[in-house]
Amino acid sequence: MNRTVTQSPPAGMGQRISQWVGLADDESRAPQMPWRFAILGTALVCAILSVYRWYQQTHSFNVGLDYFEEDFQIYWMRLFYVQMTLITLAGMIGVPLIWFTRPANPTMTARQELRLYYLILGFAAVASVVVVAALGLFVEADAAWHQVTVRDTDFTPTHIALFYFVIPAGLVGGVLGFIWLHTRVPYFSHRVSMPLGIMVAGFILIMPNLGFNEWGHTFFYAEELFAAPIHWGFVFLGWALFAIGGFVTQLIIRIIELTRVDSPATTSSAF
């Protein structure tokens, strides 16, 4: 008796990459936290920031002291133009792409939704490394740099790293994540996550505060002091990151609803 053996089609490149980074969905078991993705993503972010910090350490004191020197234009302004172009394109393409491809009525099974929240927590793990690195490697370095060097323009090696790379990248990532969450996840499709909105707004408002800070340092507050009133806006807006506790609480509440066995998961309001 002949048997017909059905073979599954070979996995495509995208599926193989998803399996390798730990994002592939195995329907034979319950959704799992994508630890491999979180570890690989964290390692990648650490590598990028480490290389950037090495670049700063290598080229700041020899070609980063005078904006009007030709070497400064080569080593720093070219870097500025490249990273700002890439970040701007990511925002200009990503925002309309996510918005105009949104489903009219997003729906998903409880299992799909639970897996999605685990994925969001994995992204949060990667983002937490970016925040710590930004505070430890770039924010403190920026203040220390301007205490020992002359601020000739708004474009200094530490500003190009912090205000024209780390913060804009986090801003674009936060905006894309905010739009995606509220257009793809049923739990958030008819409400607004205030904690996530506070975090994104903090990143956005830091940029005009940067303009005020540079204007103040140029005209009436030349000395760089950590606790100067002109820096209070950065501290206040930086506190917006504490709202991540509220966002994680929202996710945990929904995860409890989805994993409860005594009653079916129901959509409840997000506070």
Predicted regions: what they are:
Residues A47, M194-F271:
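C-terminal transmembrane-bundle signature of multipass membrane proteins
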Residues M84-P96, I160-I179, W239-A243:
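Generic alpha-helical transmembrane segments
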Residues T6-Q7, W99-A125, T183-N209, V261-F271:
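Cytoplasmic juxtamembrane regions at transmembrane-helix boundaries
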Residues N2, S18-V45, A110-V126, R184-M199, ...:
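Alpha-helical transmembrane segments and their helix-start/interface "positive-inside/aromatic belt" motifs
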Residues V126-H190:
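Membrane-proximal helix-loop-helix units in multi-pass membrane proteins
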Residues D71-G91, L119-G122:
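Interfacial helix-start motif at the membrane-water boundary
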Residues T42-S60:
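Alpha-helical transmembrane segments of multi-pass membrane proteins
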Residues T58-M77:
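Perimembrane loop-to-helix junctions flanking transmembrane segments
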